[in-house]
């Protein structure tokens, strides 16, 4: 089988390419150049100069062709600019979802089909299972590396074409051992970080540079509008966090957390953590840009939902809406952050997902 492998220059995708080559497949490697702002030597970067060289070195050693696609413009528009826009609205975006769906899968899947490939493989920790009605997305064996939450926007057609060989791997140590066994020099290379395109490591500095209107101090207030302190910029906060609130914890005698971000007024609204679950949380949440990996059930579906990348599942009834969104009715109140993903699960299977909106349901 002719398979295109999306190669980031890291251990995971390199092992995927090597395994498929060893299995006798005709492998073609491809890497997207997403940016180049001195990232070649930055630990945790992805798809920059050094990574492209590492991917090409693997392809040369194993003897298969490797292509580089210049996707800087699309990446800047689809990921970086939208990332800054979201924070300027008081949301907490998930850039990895935008990158996977708006850049990587768009460009690489198109290239794979143009090259006559029968499938495209990636180094994501996801299981693809052939179900009675077609391909299904499931959590991987290695729960610590689960990336299904970040791939909820993968469409049915894309899932049919994609392959995820690492979904059955027991852990990352096993993958690194395979890399050594396969003779890959990058076996000990560090993993990429969550926000790989932030050169300084401070996402807030990037947002403030791209959207100067969010710069500047403002007030930290309680739900009654009483001023409790000052903050250094609204882009530095997200709903649910309790860090960077200064001495407010000791001033009030109760540990506080962010409940709302009022961008026009430059206000961070906080409330006591012990009371937030009842006073400021929500049992109903609206989602936008819903992607279903099952036939959208008109009457709704009872399932588990995950409203943050590393949070527990919550029981809910999810109903499709005519505007392409969905209404999530939680059995227990939660503090969803606008802009984050809400992903639906039935056991290990991903049913779909969408983005949390700021409006009340």
From Swiss-Prot:
It is found in: Cytoplasm. Residues 145-147 are annotated as: Interaction with tRNA. The record marks 124, 340 as: Interaction with tRNA. ATP binds at residues 6-13, 32, 123. The keyword Glycosyltransferase does not apply. Signal peptide: none annotated. The active site is at residues 99, 196. It catalyses: S-sulfanyl-L-cysteinyl-[protein] + uridine(34) in tRNA + AH2 + ATP = 2-thiouridine(34) in tRNA + L-cysteinyl-[protein] + A + AMP + diphosphate + H(+). One of its GO terms (biological process) is tRNA wobble position uridine thiolation. Disulfide bonds join 99-196. One of its GO terms (cellular component) is cytoplasm. The keyword Repeat does not apply. It is an enzyme of class 2 (transferase). GO terms for molecular function: ATP binding; tRNA binding; tRNA-uridine 2-sulfurtransferase activity. Keywords: ATP-binding, Cytoplasm, Disulfide bond, Nucleotide-binding, RNA-binding, Transferase, tRNA processing, tRNA-binding. Its EC number is 2.8.1.13. Belongs to the MnmA/TRMU family. HAMAP family: tRNA_thiouridyl_MnmA. PANTHER family: MITOCHONDRIAL TRNA-SPECIFIC 2-THIOURIDYLASE 1, TRNA 5-METHYLAMINOMETHYL-2-THIOURIDYLATE -METHYLTRANSFERASE. Catalyzes the 2-thiolation of uridine at the wobble position (U34) of tRNA, leading to the formation of s(2)U34. This is tRNA-specific 2-thiouridylase MnmA. It comes from Gluconobacter oxydans (strain 621H).
């Amino acid at each position: 089988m002719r398979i295109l492998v999306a190669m980031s220059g890291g251990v995971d995708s390199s092992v995927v390419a090597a395994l498929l080559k060893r299995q006798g497949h005709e492998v073609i490697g491809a890497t997207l150049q997403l940016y180049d702002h001195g990232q070649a030597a930055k630990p945790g970067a992805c798809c920059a100069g050094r990574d492209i060289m590492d991917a090409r070195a693997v392809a040369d050693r194993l003897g298969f062709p490797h292509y580089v696609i210049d996707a800087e413009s699309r990446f800047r528009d689809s990921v970086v600019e939208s990332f800054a826009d979201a924070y300027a609205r008081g949301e907490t975006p998930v850039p990895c979802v935008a990158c996977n769906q708006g850049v990587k899968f768009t460009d690489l899947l198109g290239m794979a089909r143009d090259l006559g490939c029968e499938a495209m493989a990636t180094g994501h920790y996801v299981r693809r299972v052939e179900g009675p009605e077609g391909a299904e997305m499931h959590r991987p064996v290695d729960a610590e590396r689960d990336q299904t939450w970040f791939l909820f926007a993968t469409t049915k057609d894309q899932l049919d074409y994609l392959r995820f060989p690492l979904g059955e791997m027991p852990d990352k140590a096993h993958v690194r051992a395979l890399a050594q066994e396969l003779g890959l020099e990058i076996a000990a290379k560090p993993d990429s970080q969550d926000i790989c395109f932030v050169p300084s490591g401070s996402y807030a500095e990037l947002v403030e540079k791209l959207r100067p209107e969010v710069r500047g101090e403002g007030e930290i207030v309680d739900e009654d509008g009483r001023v409790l302190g000052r903050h250094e910029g609204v882009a530095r906060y997200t709903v649910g966090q309790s860090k960077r609130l200064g001495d407010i914890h000791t001033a009030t005698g109760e540990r506080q957390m962010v409940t709302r971000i009022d961008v026009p007024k430059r206000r961070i609204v906080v409330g006591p953590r012990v009371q937030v679950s009842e006073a400021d949380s929500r049992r109903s949440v609206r989602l936008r840009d819903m992607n279903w990996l099952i036939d959208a059930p008109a009457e709704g579906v009872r399932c588990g939902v995950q409203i943050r990348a590393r949070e527990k599942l919550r029981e809910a009834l999810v109903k499709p809406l005519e505007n392409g969104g969905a209404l999530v009715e939680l059995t227990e109140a939660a503090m969803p952050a606008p802009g984050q993903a809400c992903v639906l699960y039935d056991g290990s299977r991903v049913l779909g997902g969408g983005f949390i909106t700021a409006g009340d349901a």
